[in-house]
C-alpha cells in the first residue's frame, strides 16, 4: 500500500508538469509546434544521459546478477508482448500510432523518477535495463512503423546516439570505469530533466488540440484500455508463471521495477517520433494524456495486485 501511495503522488506531480506545458501555450508564451525542438532534446540528449548515468554504479556480483535478471525479464516480456499486440493490431484494425501507443510504455521518461522516488537511486539501474531493451525496439520496430519505412537502415540504427549510449554505459559498468565527478554530475543533471521535459511536451501538444474531439474519440479509450489494463494484466501473468521474481533475494523488487516500466502510460517517445517523422503526433499525444490520466488509478492498483500475487 505504501508504494502505491508514493506512486500516486509521483503521477500527480507529472500531471502538474503537463498542465505547465498546457498553460505556456494557452497564454501565448510559445506555440504548440515549438514542442518539436524540446522533443529532439529529450530523444537525443536527455535519454542518453539517463542511460549512461544509471550504469555509473559499483560493480558487484549482486548487481550483475540483478542486472541479468532485469535484462532477461525485459527481453522476454517485450518479445511476448510484441507478438500479442501485433496480433491485436491486425484483429482490431489498429493504425501504427495505436499499435505503438499500446506496445511502448513511458518507461524512458517515468521509470527513473518513479523508481528514485519510491525505492531509491540505487535501484534505477534495473529500470534502465528495461529502458535499454525498449530503446532497441523503439529505434527499430517503432521507428519503422511510425516513419512508414519499408526496411531498416541498420547503419542509422547502430549509429543512433541512444544505441551508442547503451554500449557506453554497459562497457563502463563491466570495465568498472567511473567518469570524473564533474562529468558524472553534469550527465546526471541533464538526465534528470527527462521527466519534466517530456511532460511539458505532452502538455504543449495537448494545448493545440480540439479537446472535444479528443475526448469524443472512442478509439482513444479503446487504446487506453489495452495499454493500461490488458497489457499490465498479461504482464503480471507472465511474471507469475515465469517464477523470475524468486530467483534471488532482490528479485521481487527487480521484477517490480520491470513491472512498473511495463504498466506506465503510452510512451511520450511515440509522440516525439511522430513529430520528427511526420506522423499523427496530436493523436499520439491525446493517447498519452488519457493514459497518463488513467495511470493515477491503474498503476497503484496494478502494484497492489503485484504485491498480492507475486
Could you tell me what each predicted segment is?
Residues 1-310:
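Alpha-helical transmembrane segments of multi-pass small-molecule/ion transporters
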Amino acid at each position: 500500500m505504501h508504494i502505491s501511495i508514493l506512486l500516486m503522488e509521483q503521477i500527480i506531480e507529472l500531471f502538474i508538469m503537463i498542465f505547465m506545458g498546457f498553460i505556456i501555450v494557452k497564454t501565448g508564451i510559445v506555440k504548440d509546434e515549438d514542442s518539436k525542438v524540446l522533443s529532439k532534446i529529450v530523444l537525443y540528449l536527455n535519454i542518453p544521459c539517463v542511460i549512461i548515468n544509471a550504469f555509473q554504479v559499483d560493480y558487484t556480483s549482486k548487481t550483475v546478477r540483478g542486472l541479468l535478471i532485469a535484462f532477461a525479464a525485459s527481453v522476454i516480456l517485450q518479445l511476448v508482448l510484441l507478438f500479442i499486440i501485433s496480433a491485436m493490431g491486425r484483429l482490431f484494425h489498429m493504425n501504427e500510432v495505436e499499435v505503438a501507443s499500446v506496445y511502448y510504455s513511458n518507461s524512458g521518461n517515468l521509470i527513473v523518477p518513479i523508481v528514485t522516488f519510491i525505492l531509491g537511486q540505487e535501484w534505477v539501474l534495473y529500470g534502465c535495463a528495461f529502458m535499454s531493451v525498449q530503446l532497441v525496439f523503439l529505434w527499430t520496430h517503432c521507428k519503422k512503423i511510425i516513419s512508414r519505412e519499408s526496411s531498416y537502415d541498420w547503419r542509422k540504427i547502430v549509429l543512433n546516439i541512444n544505441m551508442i549510449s547503451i554500449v557506453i554505459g554497459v562497457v563502463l559498468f563491466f570495465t568498472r570505469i567511473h567518469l570524473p565527478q564533474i562529468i558524472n554530475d553534469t550527465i546526471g543533471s541533464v538526465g534528470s530533466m527527462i521527466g519534466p521535459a517530456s511532460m511539458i511536451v505532452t502538455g504543449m501538444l495537448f494545448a493545440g488540440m480540439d479537446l472535444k474531439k479528443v475526448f469524443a474519440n472512442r478509439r482513444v479509450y479503446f487504446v487506453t484500455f489495452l495499454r493500461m489494463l490488458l497489457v499490465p494484466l498479461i504482464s503480471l501473468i507472465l511474471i507469475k508463471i515465469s517464477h523470475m521474481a524468486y530467483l534471488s533475494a532482490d528479485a521481487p523488487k527487480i521484477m517490480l521495477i520491470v513491472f512498473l516500466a511495463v504498466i506506465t502510460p503510452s510512451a511520450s517517445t511515440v509522440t516525439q517520433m511522430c513529430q520528427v517523422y511526420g506522423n499523427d503526433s496530436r493523436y499520439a499525444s491525446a493517447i498519452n494524456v488519457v493514459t497518463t490520466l488513467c495511470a493515477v488509478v491503474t498503476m497503484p492498483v496494478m502494484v497492489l495486485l503485484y504485491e498480492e500475487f507475486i
